[in-house]
């Protein structure tokens, strides 16, 4: 299947994943209140750290490996089973950690059943093998499965979560929506994997340990400046501030997910091109990908800054007004994470230069931790937002500098300059509308509509390659 079709399918998957919390959060936040939302998020973050350890970088490492050998049925069978068994063994260790935390940490003992329920994420992640379907580029199945599971989860949420005491139901549905579909992944593997096409005694689980460990090191460092702010807010301040911060993070991640949808599709393709030494095609694809990232992330970042009050009130309610500044402070990470994610986890990783990504993220993690220590005690969730934005900026800058020898980003190409021009224009437009109408519903609606029209018009005027391709695609569809 082509990259365009895979991108559209994955974009549908990502958008449905973003739509689910955007629909549910306004409903649940008004019922469970900031302290209830904050407690679940606090526990989910801790479980997320454990899941990160038990996964050991497998979700990314395995995609690259499956993409390389997907045409070799025997080797594909063997590697898939080896990675599944390795992940399962590590998950058992993860549950030992869960038991230790339950018996020793007072903040977790506040609600042991809730924490135990959320730990189901570990089991479903181990059996899911999502990496296999990404490696063979079966994004059609991934998208359909996700839509079905999320729809059922949405229905269940409105049926079972009606009072503040329904926190347990909310947590269960959250787990179902996130990883419940992995059960289908596991049983569907029989369609692709012949479990009798190799000798079990020939399996070598540990050959995957070291390369996956490299990705784990990278993931754990990334997780530090992605999740540490939430954990530090919970321990240093309180769950209410975690709830405020979580509201801004959820909307920011939702917007960021739109930009990152392309990256999931491109990792197996980059890996295949690099493995076959098709470097000219590799560079051309990388150039297009970076330009797409810049062209989409810039207007989304600007829109997030101007529309933060409306978005917070719309999706979270007036009780979450303290989330507005945090969301605006964090808006630059849309651009920073989009660039570093594509450059590091797709381009450089496919080239085998993951050490550059590790060095960059170490610097960002250290900066994030130090800034959190200084800023959170005095500024709470605003300080956490500042720390995260600065850390992501440093990661991106260091990665660009260290990776320049292997791939250089042409920030001032004709195509990218068009995006800067168009973004500057919509900033002026939004400032004018804000002065004319004030910060209200009319500004929100007109601001979005007029910004989209003006931005696309400028790109069309400058003959942007993506807009021209979209126009051609639409014309072909209409005339068929």
Report the location of each language-model feature:
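N-terminal membrane topogenesis motif
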Residues: 1-22, 74-77, 202-218, 323, ...
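Helix-loop junctions and terminal segments of transmembrane helices
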Residues: 26, 55-71, 248, 252-290, ...
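Membrane-proximal transmembrane or re-entrant/amphipathic helices at the cytosolic face
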Residues: 431-480
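Interhelical loop/hinge segments that connect adjacent transmembrane helices in multipass membrane
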Residues: 3, 167-174, 183-226, 265, ...
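Signature of the first transmembrane helix
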Residues: 2-60, 95, 102, 154, ...
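Membrane-interface junctions at transmembrane-helix termini in multi-pass inner-membrane proteins
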Residues: 112, 122-144, 332-363
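Interfacial segments at transmembrane-helix termini and the short loops linking adjacent helices
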Residues: 102-118, 304-335
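Hydrophobic alpha-helical transmembrane segments
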Residues: 112, 116-119, 143-191, 211, ...
């Amino acid at each position: 299947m082509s990259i365009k079709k895979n991108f559209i399918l994955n974009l549908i998957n990502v958008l449905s994943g973003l739509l689910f919390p955007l629909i549910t959060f306004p409903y649940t936040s008004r019922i469970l209140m900031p302290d209830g939302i904050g407690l679940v998020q606090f526990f989910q973050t801790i479980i997320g750290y454990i899941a990160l350890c038990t996964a050991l970088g497998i979700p990314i490492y395995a995609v690259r490996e499956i993409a390389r050998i997907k045409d070799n049925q025997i080797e594909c069978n063997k590697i898939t089973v080896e990675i599944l068994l390795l992940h399962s063994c590590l998950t058992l260790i993860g549950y030992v950690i869960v038991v230790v935390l339950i018996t020793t940490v007072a903040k977790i003992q506040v609600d042991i059943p809730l924490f135990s329920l959320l730990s189901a994420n570990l089991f479903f992640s181990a059996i899911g093998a999502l990496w296999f379907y990404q490696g063979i580029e079966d994004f059609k199945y991934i998208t359909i499965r996700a839509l079905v599971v999320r729809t059922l989860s949405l229905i269940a949420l409105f049926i079972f979560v009606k009072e503040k005491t329904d926190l347990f139901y909310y947590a269960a549905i959250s787990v179902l929506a996130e990883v419940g579909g992995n059960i289908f992944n596991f049983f569907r593997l029989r369609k692709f994997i012949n479990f009798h096409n190799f000798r079990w005694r020939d399996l070598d689980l540990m050959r995957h340990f070291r390369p996956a460990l490299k990705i784990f090191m990278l993931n754990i460092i990334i997780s530090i400046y992605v999740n540490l702010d939430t954990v530090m807010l919970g321990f240093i301040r309180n769950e209410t501030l975690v709830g405020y911060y979580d509201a801004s993070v959820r909307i920011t991640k939702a917007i960021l997910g739109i930009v990152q949808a392309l990256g999931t599709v491109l990792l197996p393709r980059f890996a295949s091109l690099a493995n076959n030494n098709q470097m000219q095609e590799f560079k051309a694809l990388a150039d297009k990908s970076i330009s797409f990232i810049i062209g989409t992330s810039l207007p989304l970042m600007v829109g997030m800054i101007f529309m933060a009050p409306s978005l917070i009130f719309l999706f979270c309610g007036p009780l979450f007004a303290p989330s507005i500044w945090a969301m605006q402070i964090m808006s630059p990470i849309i651009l920073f994470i989009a660039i570093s994610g594509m450059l590091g986890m797709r381009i450089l990783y496919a080239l085998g230069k993951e050490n550059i990504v590790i060095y960059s993220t170490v610097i960002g993690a250290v900066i994030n931790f130090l800034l959190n220590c200084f800023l959170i005690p005095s500024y709470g969730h605003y300080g956490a937002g500042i720390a995260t934005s600065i850390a992501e900026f440093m990661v991106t800058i260091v990665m660009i500098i260290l990776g320049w020898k292997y791939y250089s980003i042409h920030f001032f190409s004709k195509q990218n300059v068009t995006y800067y021009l168009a973004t500057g224009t919509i900033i002026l437009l939004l400032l004018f509308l804000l002065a004319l109408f004030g910060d209200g519903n009319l500004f929100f609606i007109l601001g979005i509509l007029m910004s989209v029209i003006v931005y696309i018009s400028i790109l069309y005027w400058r003959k942007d390659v993506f807009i021209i391709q979209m126009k051609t695609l639409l014309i072909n569809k209409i005339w068929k």
